[in-house]
Design a protein with these regions (language model features):
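Extreme N-terminal starter segment of soluble prokaryotic enzymes
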Residues: 1-2
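Fe-S ferredoxin-like electron-transfer domains
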Residues: 46-190, 203-217, 222
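Short strand-turn-strand beta-turns centered on an Asx-Gly dipeptide
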Residues: 6-9, 53-54
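Mobile "lid/hinge" segments at catalytic clefts and subdomain interfaces of large enzymes
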Residues: 162, 195, 381-385
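A short N-terminal beta-strand-loop micro-motif at the entrance of redox/enzyme domains
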Residues: 9-15
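Charged, low-complexity hinge/linker segments at coiled-coil and domain boundaries
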Residues: 197-203
Length: 566
């Protein structure tokens, strides 16, 4: 064991990759702008500087820890340096904090408060840059950018897209797409991971809050809302509820008090997806055509595939995502309801920014009407709850509305990478006993690895499965599939690392502990669920015998003849 001295305290360390990790291990929250453990070390912000016993100052994020090292994290010299850095950042920053979407969650704002920066000596002489609102998913405001490079590295190193990069030099430097294009003109898939790591309000979610409030205020409108699996373990983050705790019942109570007429669970839509996708998969296995079957639940992945690998479009499942299946069912139910003549508006609460673009795709209209009208991210619904003056933590636990409030544990785990695959396997396995279901857990599809593989016996053959999260990982896997290096029958893809629970619309920050808590929280809900398999959900069976009879393809599948999103 090796030791170093931090602020006169002896601290043991082992395989930490930098001094900053040892400092945080010692319980000192040395905040940074540009450091993320999953990204390459950049060392640009200099907020993590420390001083050694000889008076030398260096960035702790880029320094390898050494046995016997002596450092200090809060000397007068360091305090002066950090305050000066913050002043310079703030001098070139738009300081309209009260109207900023990031107000309260802004790292720059929080650090200024923490370090006592109450006066800026330097004027902001930078010209105002137009805000880019062309994307359906995110908003870019370069006036609030501090050039930390987090979005650049995330887009390149995690997603493999490289949409954003640095341009120009010196005081004119900016982060932008190539040739200063609008985001809507780029190959951006709307995953929102750049927004997750942005420490300021330079990249934010494109809000749909106002039109939803308008719909709720209209007495001639019936507002129906569906809640995605990953939302329930994240929405409590900003209300003092422990991370990863299931807050679904409290959220239902809050939404009722906000005026939503009917509240349902997207897990029910996931149950429908499992029924259709497992059927489609078996048909392809038997025919041997269009394999591997790629999942279609993640709109960011679907758009990525269409743009980079259009030749694989036929391999993507024709099944709509749970959001779109459920939206189509809700609208069809409304069309058949002659008693309620009000206009029906379907709202989705999602962990994902790409879902905002998904609802606008041409194939997601039925009889000329959008299946889902508005998407609110978890972050947006948190803001709406606070606008309504509701304390989520104090809400009673209330149940979903029926009949679409009943769902299986298989639907819940759609919120984690590997969950879709496990849900499909539960549907396919003939033995519905707990022992058989528990065996599925240990096939290799659970866990946080970016690429997971499993071989599952089915009948007289072996089914080869891959589970991948993060588009860069997906790209690498597809290259191996195309080259013949690997071969699979079923491939689950999610654009966001570890799945929807770390989606671009979730409350930030999303560190390793937060991800672990949400991951474990979703599996705890599944463990407590009395219905483990989608085909055991009685409401699903009733729906197939009733509303869906003869309409399965129309409402639950995409029409491949329609033009695809570009």
């Amino acid at each position: 064991m090796k030791y170093m001295t931090i602020n006169n305290q002896k601290v043991a360390f082992d395989d930490e990759k930098n001094v900053l990790s040892v400092i945080r291990k010692a319980g000192i929250n040395l905040l940074t702008f540009c450091y993320h453990s999953e990204l390459s070390t950049y060392g640009a912000c200099r907020m993590c500087v420390v001083e050694d016993d000889r008076g030398k100052i260096f960035a702790s994020c880029s320094e390898v820890p050494r046995d016997g090292m002596v450092i200090y994290t809060n000397t007068p010299k360091l305090q002066h340096h950090r305050k000066m850095i913050l002043e310079l950042m703030l001098s070139a920053h738009c300081r309209e904090c009260t109207t900023c979407k990031k107000n309260g969650d802004c790292t720059l704002q929080n650090l200024a408060k923490q370090l006592g920066v109450s006066y800026i000596r330097f004027e902001n002489n930078k010209p105002q840059i137009p805000i880019d609102e062309s994307s359906d998913c995110i908003v870019i405001d370069k006036n609030k950018c501090i050039l930390c490079g987090d979005c650049v590295r995330t887009c390149e190193e995690i997603q493999g897209l490289g949409i954003l990069d640095f341009a120009y030099r010196g005081s004119k430097m900016q982060v932008m797409p190539a040739f200063d294009r609008k985001m809507a003109e780029t190959a951006c898939v709307g995953c929102g991971q750049c927004r997750v790591v942005c420490p300021t309000g330079a990249i934010t979610i494109k809000h749909n809050i106002h039109p939803v409030w308008e719909a709720l205020a209209d007495k001639n409108t019936r507002v129906v809302v569906q809640i995605a699996p990953a939302v329930r373990v994240a929405v409590g983050d900003k209300f003092g509820i422990p991370k990863g705790e299931n807050s679904l019942g409290k959220l239902v109570a809050a939404l009722r008090r906000m005026g939503f007429d009917e509240i349902y669970d997207t897990d029910f839509g996931a149950d429908l997806t499992i029924m259709e996708e497992s059927k489609e998969f078996l048909e392809r296995v038997e025919s041997g055509e269009k394999l591997p079957l790629f999942t279609s639940c993640c709109p960011a992945w679907v758009k990525f595939c269409e743009q980079k690998y259009p030749e694989l479009r036929a391999n993507i499942s024709t099944c709509r995502s749970p959001q779109q299946m459920f939206g189509a069912v809700l609208k069809e139910e409304a069309r058949n309801n002659k008693k309620d003549t009000r206009k029906t508006v379907v709202v989705s609460i999602m962990p994902c920014t790409a879902k905002k673009a998904e609802i606008l795709r041409p194939e997601h209209k039925t009889e000329g009407e959008q299946d889902v009208d508005f998407v609110l991210t978890t972050t947006e619904v948190i803001r709406m709850i606070k606008e309504a003056g509701i304390d989520l933590a104090q809400m009673p636990w209330e149940a979903m509305d029926m009949p679409f409030g009943l769902s299986s544990g298989a639907g819940v785990i759609f919120g984690v990478s590997g969950g879709v695959t496990e849900a499909v396997l539960r549907r396919l396995v003939e033995d519905s006993g707990m022992e058989a279901l528990n065996e599925i857990k240990f096939t290799g599809i659970r866990g946080t690895d970016g690429i997971k593989e499993a071989v599952i016996p089915y009948g007289d053959r072996q089914i080869k499965i891959a589970v991948v999260s993060g588009l860069k990982n997906a790209d690498e896997l597809i290259q191996k599939i195309k080259s013949g290096e690997v071969q699979y029958d079923f491939v689950e893809v999610m654009a966001c690392r570890r799945g929807c629970m770390a989606g671009g619309g979730q409350p930030v920050p999303i560190g390793a502990r937060t991800k672990a808590a949400r991951y474990e929280g979703l599996y705890r809900i599944d463990d407590a669920s009395q219905i483990k398999r989608s085909n055991d959900n009685p409401i699903v069976g009733e729906l197939y015998e009733g509303l869906l009879k003869g309409k399965e393809h129309k409402l639950l599948h995409n029409n491949s003849d329609l033009p695809q999103a570009k």
